Amino acid sequence: MKGACILAWLFSSLGVWRLARPETQDPAKCQRAEHPVVSYKEIGPWLREFRAENAVDFSRLTFDPGQKELVVGARNYLFRLELEDLSLIQAVEWECDEATKKACYSKGKSKEECQNYIRVLLVGGDRLFTCGTNAFTPVCTIRSLSNLTEIHDQISGMARCPYSPQHNSTALLTASGELYAATAMDFPGRDPAIYRSLGTLPPLRTAQYNSKWLNEPNFVSSYDIGNFTYFFFRENAVEHDCGKTVFSRPARVCKNDIGGRFLLEDTWTTFMKARLNCSRPGEVPFYYNELQGTFFLPELDLIYGIFTTNVNSIASSAVCVFNLSAISQAFNGPFKYQENSRSAWLPYPNPNPNFQCGTMDQGLYVNLTERNLQDAQKFILMHEVVQPVTTVPSFMEDNSRFSHLAVDVVQGRETLVHIIYLGTDYGTIKKVRAPLSQSSGSCLLEEIELFPERRSEPIRSLQILHSQSVLFVGLQEHVAKIPLKRCHFHQTRSACIGAQDPYCGWDAVMKKCTSLEESLSMTQWDQSIPTCPTRNLTVDGSFGPWSPWTPCTHTDGTAVGSCLCRSRSCDRPAPQCGGWQCEGPRMEITNCSRNGGWTPWTSWSPCSTTCGIGFQVRQRSCSNPTPRHGGRVCVGQNREERYCNEHLLCPPHVFWTGWGPWERCTAQCGGGIQARRRTCENGPDCAGSNVEYHPCNTNACPELKKTTPWTPWTPVNISDNGGHYEQRFRYTCKARLPDPNLLEVGRQRIEMRYCSSDGTSGCSTDGLSGDFLRAGRYSAHTVNGAWSAWTSWSQCSRDCSRGIRNRKRVCNNPEPKFGGMPCLGPSLEFQECNILPCPVDGVWSCWSSWSKCSATCGGGHYMRTRSCSNPAPAYGGDICLGLHTEEALCNTQTCPESWSEWSDWSVCDASGTQVRARQCILLFPVGSQCSGNTTESRPCVFDSNFIPEVSVARSSSVEEKRCGEFNMFHMFHMMAVGLSSSILGCLLTLLVYTYCQRYQQQSHDATVIHPVSPAALNSSITNHINKLDKYDSVEAIKAFNKNNLILEERNKYFNPHLTGKTYSNAYFTDLNNYDEY
């Protein structure tokens, strides 16, 4: 660009800003006190998260007994996670089948609702009891905690799990195996109940469709405390006479309650409820009526609760703390009773003050609780209100709603401090220090953001693990783990002390912020927590995102071009309260159109020749500037040439001629040399050599061998028994030489023969030859060598399958001396041995799979086999030891009796036959159940000594007349009695038949809803639960189910010896929808 105006425009466009303080802002705004906020970016290094594809609604969290794993329940999934880093151990999909979903859709429910939402997740020993909504057909399973795919049992979820994912519920499992659940028991949610099932005690529930017991409750939590089981919930206040309002309540039942007798059968006789008060004191108190969550500290008998205002009022939340003794005091006080609907609610003395679940020892009501059954039916609501520990809530905040809480007890430098963690409906965790004394207040220490900026969602679950000081948060799409001790976040002493964090203090020895456990000395550990921390409101500015690229214009001298421009603002955030302005450009410019311009010419290049005519070159390029984005290209040539040295003549040319041919190699083999030559033309001053050499015929010469003829036989001065020896010689030489004449005599070969003196046997040369060096000489007294005797054969190298053995001899009998002949023949001899194959011992094959059990009940057996074929025994090897067949017992449980007892034998009929009958006691017999006849007959058996009665005929006419009169009278009498008996019998039969039909219908429906035999989640039997939908009115439901108890309450569903106290609260934070059902 050219010109001063263009340069100034460029500087302003690029936004070269100096660092400067912002303009003065409102001092009052910058001096307000706000609590510290830990952003998602700041908490990121400590945060651990778990996500799974297609898994949402992580609303159930619990720990294994060893506190090494986190068990998570989400929609259609169960997970096992490592506590350390939330890494996945096991994932199990638990989804509804298509038939159940279609049935759910047919009832008008959405695809989102017709899923399996996990709402009960309880750990007992090494088992996991879990229930899901299963598309409005709740079902429960008992699984192995170490392998979630291993299902031990499956039962109906009715009265244990809500039908709808929007219904609030709570459940706990006691040490004796009883399951206490508070939930809606029907599809539309009109029948809420507190229900006990499983275990050894009979099933009980709250009174059905009685608003004085439960009036549209929203269940929050439950706890097993002493002799009682406590439930916390909120409901429409039945005692409130003016309008409709919601009260929060504690309720309790005795764990040894077995229900009433004749009155309150199958119903709690110890159910009582009171009201919890959490309010802001004043001339007109401000009430927080709706309980949202609780947390129980068993060591201190304290129950923390979070309360909010009604959803239709201004959002406000509070935390109140209740002592268990205050709740017990309310239950020991008077009742609040209303005689009838037109009467007022009045206090009534408690007939059983300080009731501790005592039972009757004798009489008609033995084992029943001490409460009078009529009192238990009338007196439900307590008169006194449970007041919190302090008159002012421990913590209050307007314009927010809390949904979940957890409490940790921390040892500070001087005292124990209670830290409250509050989950909000917009996805943050507020860390609150409870009041240190009655006169002091609470402090909001910090607020932790679990999502990036401008994103939020409600918290689904909150669990604290005190042993590891860790907080686990269940959210819609993931699970988060937050460490409670983050002292290393504070780098300086002022930041550490100023944070007012009860977990942290400054260690003067280590010069860093540590927890009390990490400090080297408590006397050198400094902490100050009497005041509340405040947030530094100074905010440095930060740029927001760039705007999209847009066209803009620019001036280049007299030409106008186009560019692309974008800008950004210093508003994410804007500088506040003395913060620095943003550093960097606020505008960027790119892709500006530009006309091309020539660079200056380069210098002329050197002449292309040193003599004679040559040429020179100079160049320029269109890069000053280069044309861009549609700009004009340069006009003209980018290269110029000119002649040079046109008047400078060149001298004669001196040069080498070409190389001549290669001369003959100096050697035919073994490496020689070749040469070639050239000559210098037009003078003697050519650079370089005129001769060039290179090797040739480098291949090795062939091996030559030369042998001399034998010399004549010459006698040797050695005599033996009158004879003499003669010998002759010859020499052999070999080498790789190009000329055979270059060979020299090498190794000498000698032959000797023995000639007898008499000439009879001639001369013999057997074994008398050998090779000697040319320099070798013979002694005058040579001694020929002789072999010693063979040694014994050595041990065979193998015991079987063809081995080798050897034997030796030595040339020392005698040794050859003075040029004597050496021993001829081998000194070592080999022989094969043990050629038979090795024996093969038999080895068992692997066991086959266990066969199916031979019987389904009453004791059967499994069977598995193996064979001695891996390998089979051979060549005398041992056979396999052990059994080839194994059996094991199975299905040893007693077969269920399907027939009733046989009736007594009937009276003999006219044909002399007796009959007896039996009935099938199963409603739906399967397999071999109820096989056989329902009746059985046999001939009558008479006693041999029995004499039948014989009537003797009388001939007297008087007697005959008397008998006739007697018979006629008695005949009419007997006819009247028989007729009346028949009518009475028919009436009784009709009454018994009607009663049996009604009883059988109830048993049939209840059995269909809750089959006695465990069924699969997706079996057709569980689909019969939908029969409830044919009842459209409350009256019809009442007629269908008198007390709505489940028939399958048997101890087989959960082992009471493996369970501990476990709680599960199904509670949700969508406060705008919790009352929709």
Curated annotation (Swiss-Prot):
Q: Where is the signal peptide?
A: 1-21
User: So which stretches are on the Extracellular side?
Assistant: 22-971
Query: In Gene Ontology terms, what is one molecular function of this protein?
Result: semaphorin receptor binding
TSP type-1 domain mapped to chain residues: 540-593, 595-651, 653-702, 707-765, 784-839, 841-896, 897-944
Return the CDD domains for the record.
Answer: Sema_5A
Transmembrane segment boundaries:
972-992
State the membrane topology. Single-pass type I membrane protein
* Covalent S-S links between cysteines: 104-114, 131-140, 254-357, 278-320, 487-504, 496-513, 607-644, 611-650, 622-634, 665-696, 669-701, 680-686, 796-833, 800-838, 811-823, 853-890, 857-895, 868-880
In the UniProt record for this chain, what is stated about the effect of gene disruption? Mutant mice die between 11.5 and 12.5 dpc. At this stage, no defects are detected in the development of extraembryonic tissues, cardiovascular system, axonal trajectories and peripheral nervous system. Mutants display decreased complexity of the hierarchically organized branches of the cranial blood vessels. Mutant mice are viable and fertile.
Provide the residues annotated with a glycan attachment (glycosylation).
Answer: 147, 168, 227, 277, 323, 367, 536, 591, 717, 933
SUPFAM superfamilies in the cross-refs: Plexin repeat, Sema domain, TSP-1 type 1 repeat
Q: Which UniProt keywords apply?
A: Developmental protein, Differentiation, Disulfide bond, Glycoprotein, Membrane, Neurogenesis, Repeat, Signal, Transmembrane, Transmembrane helix
One Gene Ontology CC term in the entry: membrane
Major location, coarse class? membrane
> So which domain of life are we looking at?
Eukaryota
> Subunit comment for this entry?
Binds PLXNB3.
- What job does this protein perform? Bifunctional axonal guidance cue regulated by sulfated proteoglycans; attractive effects result from interactions with heparan sulfate proteoglycans (HSPGs), while the inhibitory effects depend on interactions with chondroitin sulfate proteoglycans (CSPGs). Ligand for receptor PLXNB3. In glioma cells, SEMA5A stimulation of PLXNB3 results in the disassembly of F-actin stress fibers, disruption of focal adhesions and cellular collapse as well as inhibition of cell migration and invasion through ARHGDIA-mediated inactivation of RAC1.
Q: Which family does it belong to?
A: Belongs to the semaphorin family.
According to UniProt, the name of this protein is Semaphorin-5A
Q: Which organism is it from?
A: Mus musculus
Organism ancestry: Eukaryota, Metazoa, Chordata, Craniata, Vertebrata
